[in-house]
Amino acid sequence: MTMLKDPSQKYRPFTPIALPDRTWPDKVIDRAPIWLSTDLRDGNQSLIEPMDAEKKMRFFKCLVAVGLKEIEVGFPSASQTDFDFVRELIEGGHIPDDVTIQVLTQARDDLIERTFESLKGAKRAIVHYYNACAPSFRKIVFNQDKAGVKAIAVAAGKTIKRLAAAQPDTQWGFEYSPEVFSSTETDFAVEVCNAVIEVFQPTPANKLILNLPATVECATPNNYADQIEWFGRHVDRRDSVLISVHTHNDRGTGVAASELAVMAGADRVEGCLFGNGERTGNVCLVTLALNLYTQGVDPQLDFSDIDAVRKVVEDCNQIPVHPRHPYAGDLVHTAFSGSHQDAIRKGFAQQKDDAVWEVPYLPIDPADIGRDYEAVIRVNSQSGKGGITFLLEQEYGISLPRRMQIEFSQVVQRETDRLGLEMTAAQIYQLLESEYLQASAPYALKGHRLQEENGTSAVDVEVISAGESHHWRGIGKGPLEALVAGLPVAVEIMDYSEHAIGAGTNAKAAAYIELRVNGGRALHGIGIDENLTTASFRALFSALNRALSQAESRAA
């Protein structure tokens, strides 16, 4: 089957609402909306392998550290794992006093009751329920007319209100979503939401959240903004409701749709870090927040160490962040074009520390989000980096991790600039040796003893420094953690990988590590040895020595 020459035979254009007096195009976003992360619910349910309890807790703590005050933590009536996770959050005291958890439930009494069971003992919680209102869902999925759909929303609301009253020690919030709002007749969405408002009787001091999802993105963002503004004009008790938006990215405009919706009156935005979520994903909260930041608006979220946040998200979701993802991708602050690099260099030369940011091609100062400038001003091209990686793999069996490829390409570029010549594979390998494998000062690893018992590793390493022998001892859950515990400086391991070089009895292990010393910038190290543990230790000392040497050079 091929694409139709006349797609109008199969597809119909979106029918916009009439709003000739729209006001949103003249609005400016001058403050952050209320943010809600649905990474642990919408994001988690879209993963090939949903997160286990350990990953969910790690992700939750990351969201709290970033500054999220509302976090949708699961769908407890649909998953025992989610139910148990909600209980652990509450019983384990993991929820800060200024953070409110939210859970999702369908509009069914048995599921609502199970949801309230999961929330027993919570200080504050939002119960979020939904039912689909769009014509296609009414006709195809549920075989319900408009009256039936509205009755479901009202009945479920009454059940939620009754069960909440039975648990008065919890400070309750309520959220209703007319699912697939973007494809629903807007006047009918208002009718259903007004009926829900009558159930909950919200006040300006105790507002009801009305979440208007673009469950499937079906039109240009301006149409969604029109729907939001029209809804805000016609919904009852506007001063007693929070209009929330939840955009997906089916047409690739989820960020724009959310931003225009806020201009149109939305108070609150739901999304995921780096845009995870069903199909093409939810709107990316990182992009939205940093878009505000680069307009001089405090986003109320902290991405000062964006790579650490990205590491948690990638580990938990098992999905890499695209190299071109706004703000967070490996390549977003890198210019390969010579003319771009020239403009960036001139911009840095003229940029004053306390001046308005005006460096060409860079909408944000990379340092604000924990990035350094080396990748920005490197002169190596993409093909050059790819060639370096290819030669090392083909000639020496060395497969550098992605971020290390970028770091080492800068080393190669500096050498080619110095020599003014093309470097051979042997010369590139010699440079790799001198930069990483021979990095033995100020600390040279002479040997180590490792004892492992009941999942605990104890290590004793002998180190030569300034001609004198020292012994460092540490204990941890594995050899590397034990070694880090014994170091005289603070080391944070950002990434670690390993592979075999060769096969059979002559095989060696190659270990790669990315770490930070004393909170400094991330650097890499390599270790190669017949023994994997030794290779990993050599990699750590390689990176450690490089970091300390560079810090000493900068201080000088």
UniProtKB/Swiss-Prot annotation:
<keyword id="KW-0963">Cytoplasm</keyword>
<keyword id="KW-0460">Magnesium</keyword>
<dbReference type="GO" id="GO:0003985">
    <property type="term" value="F:acetyl-CoA C-acetyltransferase activity"/>
</dbReference>
<dbReference type="Pfam" id="PF00682">
    <property type="entry name" value="HMGL-like"/>
</dbReference>
<feature type="binding site">
    <location>
        <position position="42"/>
    </location>
    <ligand>
        <name>Mg(2+)</name>
    </ligand>
</feature>
<dbReference type="GO" id="GO:0000287">
    <property type="term" value="F:magnesium ion binding"/>
</dbReference>
<dbReference type="InterPro" id="IPR002034">
    <property type="entry name" value="AIPM/Hcit_synth_CS"/>
</dbReference>
<comment type="similarity">
    <text>Belongs to the alpha-IPM synthase/homocitrate synthase family. LeuA type 2 subfamily.</text>
</comment>
<feature type="binding site">
    <location>
        <position position="248"/>
    </location>
    <ligand>
        <name>Mg(2+)</name>
    </ligand>
</feature>
<protein>
    <recommendedName>
        <fullName>2-isopropylmalate synthase</fullName>
        <ecNumber>2.3.3.13</ecNumber>
    </recommendedName>
</protein>
<keyword id="KW-0432">Leucine biosynthesis</keyword>
<feature type="binding site">
    <location>
        <position position="282"/>
    </location>
    <ligand>
        <name>Mg(2+)</name>
    </ligand>
</feature>
<keyword id="KW-0808">Transferase</keyword>
<dbReference type="Pfam" id="PF22615">
    <property type="entry name" value="IPMS_D2"/>
</dbReference>
<dbReference type="InterPro" id="IPR039371">
    <property type="entry name" value="LeuA_N_DRE-TIM"/>
</dbReference>
<comment type="subunit">
    <text>Homodimer.</text>
</comment>
<dbReference type="InterPro" id="IPR013709">
    <property type="entry name" value="2-isopropylmalate_synth_dimer"/>
</dbReference>
<dbReference type="Pfam" id="PF08502">
    <property type="entry name" value="LeuA_dimer"/>
</dbReference>
<dbReference type="InterPro" id="IPR000891">
    <property type="entry name" value="PYR_CT"/>
</dbReference>
<comment type="pathway">
    <text>Amino-acid biosynthesis; L-leucine biosynthesis; L-leucine from 3-methyl-2-oxobutanoate: step 1/4.</text>
</comment>
<keyword id="KW-0479">Metal-binding</keyword>
<dbReference type="InterPro" id="IPR054692">
    <property type="entry name" value="LeuA-like_post-cat"/>
</dbReference>
<dbReference type="InterPro" id="IPR005668">
    <property type="entry name" value="IPM_Synthase"/>
</dbReference>
<dbReference type="GO" id="GO:0009098">
    <property type="term" value="P:L-leucine biosynthetic process"/>
</dbReference>
<feature type="domain" description="Pyruvate carboxyltransferase">
    <location>
        <begin position="33"/>
        <end position="307"/>
    </location>
</feature>
<comment type="function">
    <text>Catalyzes the condensation of the acetyl group of acetyl-CoA with 3-methyl-2-oxobutanoate (2-ketoisovalerate) to form 3-carboxy-3-hydroxy-4-methylpentanoate (2-isopropylmalate).</text>
</comment>
<dbReference type="InterPro" id="IPR013785">
    <property type="entry name" value="Aldolase_TIM"/>
</dbReference>
<keyword id="KW-0100">Branched-chain amino acid biosynthesis</keyword>
<dbReference type="GO" id="GO:0005737">
    <property type="term" value="C:cytoplasm"/>
</dbReference>
<dbReference type="GO" id="GO:0003852">
    <property type="term" value="F:2-isopropylmalate synthase activity"/>
</dbReference>
<feature type="binding site">
    <location>
        <position position="246"/>
    </location>
    <ligand>
        <name>Mg(2+)</name>
    </ligand>
</feature>
<dbReference type="InterPro" id="IPR036230">
    <property type="entry name" value="LeuA_allosteric_dom_sf"/>
</dbReference>
<keyword id="KW-0028">Amino-acid biosynthesis</keyword>
<feature type="region of interest" description="Regulatory domain">
    <location>
        <begin position="439"/>
        <end position="556"/>
    </location>
</feature>
